[in-house]
Each structure stands twice: as C-alpha cells, then as structure tokens.
C-alpha cells in the first residue's frame, strides 16, 4: 500500500504545483528553474498526500469484507486514488480561481478555467478506468495500466500547456512624484484619514450601543458609514495598496503580503494558493517571506498624486513605504520602529521622509517613553510581549503622527493603526464568546476587554481629530478588512500544525467599513456597499481633483450632502501615471 500511496501523493502534488504555477504566470517552465519549486513545495506536499492516501487505503482495508492486498502499483487502486486526486485538484483550481479572479489577468483566468475542466474530465476518466479494470479482470491489466499512464500524464500536461511557458511582466514607467514647480493651492479643505487593520463594524456598533467607544458612537450618530468590500488575499499590504491607489492588484502590482522565496533558491513566488495550507510553507521554513518595498507599487499612491497637485501630505505607519517616498510633506514607514533599533537606522533612517523630520520623530518617541501607562493594564490581561508589542507600536506611531501634524500642518493626514489585526487574531474569542459557543470562566472573561482596549486607542484618536476639524474639513475612518471568528475546522488545523491560540481570521475577506464625519458629510448609515478601491477616488473628489479613468474605484458622492455635491461635479483624467 505504501508504494501506491506515494504514487498517488506524487500525482496530487503535481496538481498543487500546477495551481502554484498558474497563480504565478511569470514563473518560467524551465526544468532548472522549476527544480527548487519541486524540491521544496513539492516535497512538503508529496509527504502529506502520501500519508493521506495511505490512511484512505487503511480505512478501505478495515471496511472491506475480504482481505484487501493491492499490488505494488495496482491499476485499480491508483485509478480510484487518481480520481480522488483529480477531483480535489479541480476543486482546488476552481476555488482559487473564484477567490483570486480579481487579481489575475484574463489569460490566467481562462487557463485556470480550462485546467479545472481538464482535471474534472480526468477524474471521470479515472473512475471509468477503475470500472473497466474491475469488469474485465486480469485480461485488461496491461491496457488499463497504459490508459492509467495516459490519463495521469494528460491531466498534468494539458493544464501546464494551457498555462503557457511563462510571461515576462512589463516594466512600468511613470513621472516623478513631486512637481516642484507646481504652486500649492490655498488652505482649503483638510482631510484626516484614520486607517484600521481588522476593524469590525459589528463590534463597534455593539460597543457604542452599550455606551462604550463614545467617539465612534458620535461618528455613527452624526456622520455617514458604509461597509467596504475588500479583496483576496486579505493581507494588509494588498488591501491598502488597492485603497491607496484606487486600483486592483492587477494594476497596482501588490498581490499578497510579500514576495515568497524558495528556501533552496530559484524564482520567487508572488501568490500562494489557498485551501491547501500553503501558508504553512512559510511557517515551516520551506518559503522565506520578503516584505514589499515602495518600489513594488506599479502605480501612484494617493500621497504621490496629491503631492504633484500641490497638497501637503502626512502619512504615518503605512506599508509599501520603505524606503519612504518623496512627497510634499512627510512619510514615516511602518518599518521605522524596526529599523530604528539598528545603529544605522537610528541616525539616518530610510523609513522617514524628509530626513529633517527625524528630529521630530525622535522627540515624539522620547515624550512617549516618559509615559508608563500600557495599552492594556496588567490587571486586565497578562499579555505576552508578542501581542502587547502591537499596542506599543500603535501608541508610538500615534504619537509620531500627532507630533508631525502639529509641527508641519499638512492638508491631508493619513495615519494607520495595526494592533486590532494582531490582537483580533488572538482575543476575538474572548470579546465575542457567543460567536464561538463558549461559556468563559473567570480567567478568560477578564480577557474579554483586551480587544476593546485597543479600539479605545483609536477612539481617542477619533475624538482628537473631531475636535480639530474646521467647517470645511472631513475625517474618514477606514477599515480595509474586517475580522471574524475562525471556524471549527480551521481552529483544529491551527491546533495541530499552527498556532493553537489563534481564533480570529480574515481569510474569507470579511467586509471593512468607511466612516465619514464633518460638516459636508451626509448623516446616516448607507445601505450601499462600497469597495476598498473607492477610498482614493473619494478623497480626490472631495479635494476637487479629477478621478483617473484607469482607476477601478468610484467616488462615493453619497457620503456628502447634496449642497456639497451639487456644486462639485465629478471630473476625470485619463491617468495620473504619466
């Protein structure tokens, strides 16, 4: 049974590797280039699939009325295992296509559709072959063996041929980010964007209804709010790249949380399949995750667009800003705190622009270090350093943003808060026990306030921003993606091969939200559902700038009062990239 299990595991592994290649169309089909992929990713899967196949055969043995003893390479056994592998491969291919369709080009979508159909046909062929082998007995042994090889070979070769030899990604070219001879506009309206990773509108509504998070409640009562559809994969880098550019990953170039390098060398991967524990490859060291840099973006972000049109911008704690891009204003990357811990980073950090702003940043950190109040009081929850560090990071960047905004007075500020994502993964269960069917004991019940404490930091920031708004100013509170309870199956997987404490997830792309507050904003909760790519067009519209026709998002004029929109029609420009 072992040899049959290994053969079936190898076939199933080939199907997974095909999906990996389909999701990474730039990967060339050259044996020397594919070797590292096979020896790392392939090795990981062939072992697991062989074990699964062996378990299935043992279960078959236990359920059989007669002794089941297949040959070393049994045509009948391999036909049934091949049928299961091909069916699972077709389902995996189709599920990844449905999930990632918006980040794939049309050629890849077509190849995956046809590849899934090929594997489905192969599964049916394997079933018919197994029936023929059983019906005709030993007389059909060799013809069936030949047919088995043909079906297996074609089930691999056809999807690979449909995928093609690999496509070279074109180089992007665009103008410089700052038009230094551009005359800045007058004082005008100001925009304050508070961005949140993993914020849940349902959690906020429930907390405000019970009298907590008062500033969120003020926005809900006197501002506008709508849900935001997010994207797959739901990583902060991919989601915020879409929000900051108004373009989907196919255009902005950011398709995942990072670039994945094979541990044994070879070409990098940009996208990993889901529904097959592929991200465990990073956890187990088969793949090395390299963070994106500011050079990854293939189009202009909002701060670059505004800078070229004379608006001063202040951006703090954003991904894809290392090294910090040149803007009319300032940028502090989300890598600053990590780099500041190195000798070179403390002196002249590439995570801060302009360089003279580093004095203001250092002063903000010194002021914060004088405070001893933790984000979550020790009496409330004994957090380990990994989880508490997320709160410390948010407090530090919050203080940096306040210091720089006070000194430099930008017209548009964009400040991001990350801790809800990290904390939500581990403490959602205690904040929403009814969603997990749990009855918490006293120890775990004390942890129920941990998540809300981190919402409280953002609630304070919202309160300060509201107090600073002028009659023509607007505040946007944007959560690029939500957080929801992890289902039982995923929790079991995490307990076996992952992190047993994890209970919150955003793998299924739960909705985020966008709140607007200010004199020009219409009141009420909007029933329409926006998308993360609508954020940048909406900001451009409010500031009186045209919308790029190559943007995938739309200006959400329904956030504003009719007296505002009647005097400000939507205008367009072909693109901001040249």
Residue ranges and their predicted role:
Residues 2-173, 247-441:
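His/Asp/Glu-rich, glycine-adjacent segments
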Residues 225-247, 316-326, 416-419, 481-485, ...:
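Short, solvent-exposed turn/loop segments enriched in Gly/Ser/Thr/Pro and often Arg
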Residues 34-39, 202-258, 312-314:
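Short, structured active-site-proximal loop/turn typified by the sulfatase FGly-forming signature C/S-X-P-X-R
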Residues 463, 496-545, 562:
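Substrate-binding rim/cap in mid-to-C-terminal beta-strand-loop elements of soluble/periplasmic
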Residues 178-180, 471-518, 552, 568-572:
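Histidine-centered active-site microenvironments of extracellular/periplasmic hydrolases
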Residues 184-205, 218-220, 243, 306, ...:
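Beta-strand elements within well-structured catalytic alpha/beta cores of enzymes
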Residues 164-227, 234:
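Active-site-proximal N-terminal segment of extracellular/periplasmic enzymes that hydrolyze or transfer
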Residues 484-490, 527-534, 542-577:
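Polar, surface-exposed loop/tail segments
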């Amino acid at each position: 049974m072992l040899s049959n299990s290994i053969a079936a595991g190898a076939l199933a592994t080939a199907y997974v590797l095909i999906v990996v290649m389909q999701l990474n169309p730039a990967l060339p089909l050259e044996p020397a280039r594919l070797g590292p992929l096979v020896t790392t990713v392939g090795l990981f899967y062939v072992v697991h699939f062989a074990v699964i196949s062996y378990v299935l055969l043992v279960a078959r043995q236990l359920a059989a009325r007669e002794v089941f003893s297949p040959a070393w390479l049994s045509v009948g056994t391999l036909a049934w295992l091949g049928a299961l592998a091909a069916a699972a491969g077709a389902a995996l291919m189709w599920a990844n296509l449905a999930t990632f369709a918006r980040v794939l080009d049309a050629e890849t979508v077509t190849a995956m559709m046809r590849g899934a159909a090929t594997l489905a046909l192969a599964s049916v062929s394997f079933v018919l072959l197994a029936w023929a082998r059983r019906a005709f007995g030993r007389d059909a042994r060799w013809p069936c063996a030949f047919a088995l090889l043909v079906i297996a070979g074609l089930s691999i070769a056809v999807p690979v041929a449909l995928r093609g030899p690999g496509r070279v990604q074109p180089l992007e070219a665009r103008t410089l980010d700052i038009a230094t001879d551009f005359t800045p506009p007058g004082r005008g309206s100001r925009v304050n964007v508070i961005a949140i990773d993993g914020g849940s509108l349902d959690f906020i509504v429930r907390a405000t209804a019970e009298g907590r998070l008062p500033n969120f409640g003020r926005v809900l009562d006197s501002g506008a709010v709508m849900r935001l559809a997010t994207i797959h994969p739901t990583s902060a880098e991919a989601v915020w790249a879409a929000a900051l550019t108004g373009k989907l990953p196919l255009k902005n170039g950011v398709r995942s949380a990072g670039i994945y390098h094979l541990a044994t060398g070879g070409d990098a991967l940009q996208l990993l399949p889901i529904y097959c524990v592929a991200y465990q490859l990073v956890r187990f060291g088969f793949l090395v995750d390299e963070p994106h840099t500011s050079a990854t973006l293939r189009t202009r972000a909002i701060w670059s667009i505004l800078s070229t049109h004379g608006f001063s911008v202040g951006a703090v704690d954003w991904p894809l800003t290392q090294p910090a891009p040149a803007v009319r204003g300032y940028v502090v990357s989300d890598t600053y705190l990590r780099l500041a811990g190195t000798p070179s980073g403390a002196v002249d950090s590439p995570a801060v622009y302009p360089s003279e702003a580093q004095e203001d940043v250092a002063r903000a950190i010194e002021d914060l270090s004088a405070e001893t109040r933790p984000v979550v009081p020790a009496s409330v929850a004994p957090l380990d350093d990994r989880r508490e560090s997320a709160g410390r990071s948010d407090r530090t960047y919050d203080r940096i943003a306040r210091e720089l905004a006070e000194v430099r007075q930008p017209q548009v500020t964009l400040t991001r808060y990350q801790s809800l994502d990290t904390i939500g993964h581990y403490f959602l269960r205690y904040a929403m026990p009814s969603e997990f069917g749990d009855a918490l004991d006293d120890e775990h019940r004390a942890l129920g306030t941990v998540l809300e404490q981190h919402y409280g930091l953002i609630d304070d920031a919202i309160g300060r921003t509201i107090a600073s708004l002028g009659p023509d100013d607007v505040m946007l509170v944007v959560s690029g993606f939500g957080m929801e309870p992890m289902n039982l199956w995923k929790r079991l997987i995490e307990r076996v091969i992952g992190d047993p404490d994890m209970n919150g997830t955003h793998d299924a792309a739960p909705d985020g939200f966008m709140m607007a507050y200010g004199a020009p904003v219409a009141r009420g909760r909007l029933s329409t559902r926006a998308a993360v790519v609508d954020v940048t067009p909406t900001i451009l519209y409010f500031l009186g700038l045209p919308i790029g026709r190559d943007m995938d998002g739309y200006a959400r004029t329904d956030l504003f009062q009719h007296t505002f929109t009647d005097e400000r029609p939507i205008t367009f420009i072909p693109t901001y990239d040249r």
